């Protein structure tokens, strides 16, 4: 892989149940319009790294913290940023069967129940098969399933590269990434 670079964003959770969205502007990295001999450009995402920490952005989540959430990065154009309670996700947005889903993670705070698992990444792109975004935005989305006892910061880092796309591939990706 050459010309790989990193993009990142984060979002603060709250303690109440509900959905939240942070928008990552990708418009300077994608150009879904082929002009003459110039081919369209997409953003290939090879890896997604999730980090979940205390609300100070530095400390690990305290062991006594309780609650659960699911988070993911989605190729979605037009979703406004929204805090918990002001966003409402449709059914089947944060799961592996959603074609717009790039990567996702489940988080179970350590004090919720004995033997709670560590954060579980349930979907991610790969170096061999990257997720190619051709829309202007990606959204970091989360759903607090069980009230959290403390607030947290969900951060992501994307390993990505700009790639050129032939017309057939570009058309297929545009169809797939249309809501």
Task: Set out the residue ranges of the language-model regions.
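Noncatalytic modules at the cell exterior or secretory-pathway interfaces
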Residues: 40-51, 129-148, 152
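C-terminal interaction-tip segments
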Residues: 1-21, 37-42, 52-54, 63, ...
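Extended, solvent-exposed segments with strong compositional bias
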Residues: 77-132
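Short, flexible coil/linker segments at or flanking structured domains
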Residues: 33-38, 121-122, 126-128, 146
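Extracellular distal adhesion/interaction modules in secreted or cell-surface proteins
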Residues: 4, 12-13, 31-41, 86-105
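Generic detector of solvent-exposed, compositionally biased contiguous segments
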Residues: 1-27, 107-131
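A structural detector for beta-sheet-dominated domains
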Residues: 10-14, 27, 46, 51-53, ...
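Beta-rich globular "head" domains
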Residues: 23-89, 155, 159-161
């Amino acid at each position: 892989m050459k010309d790989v670079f990193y993009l990142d964003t984060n979002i603060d959770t709250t303690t109440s149940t509900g959905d939240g969205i942070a928008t990552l502007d990708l418009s300077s990295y994608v150009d879904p319009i082929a002009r003459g001999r110039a081919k369209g450009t997409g953003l290939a995402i090879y890896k997604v790294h999730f980090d979940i920490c205390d609300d100070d952005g530095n400390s690990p989540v305290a062991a006594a913290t309780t609650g659960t959430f699911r988070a993911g990065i989605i190729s979605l154009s037009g979703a406004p940023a929204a805090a918990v309670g002001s966003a409402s996700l449709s059914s089947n947005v944060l799961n592996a069967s959603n074609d717009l889903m790039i990567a996702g993670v489940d988080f179970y705070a350590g004090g919720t129940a004995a033997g709670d698992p560590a954060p579980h990444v349930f979907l991610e792109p790969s170096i061999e098969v990257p997720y190619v975004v051709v829309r202007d935005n990606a959204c970091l989305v989360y759903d607090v399933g069980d009230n959290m006892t403390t607030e947290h910061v969900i951060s992501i880092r994307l390993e990505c590269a700009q790639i050129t796309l032939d017309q057939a591939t570009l058309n297929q990706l545009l169809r797939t990434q249309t809501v």
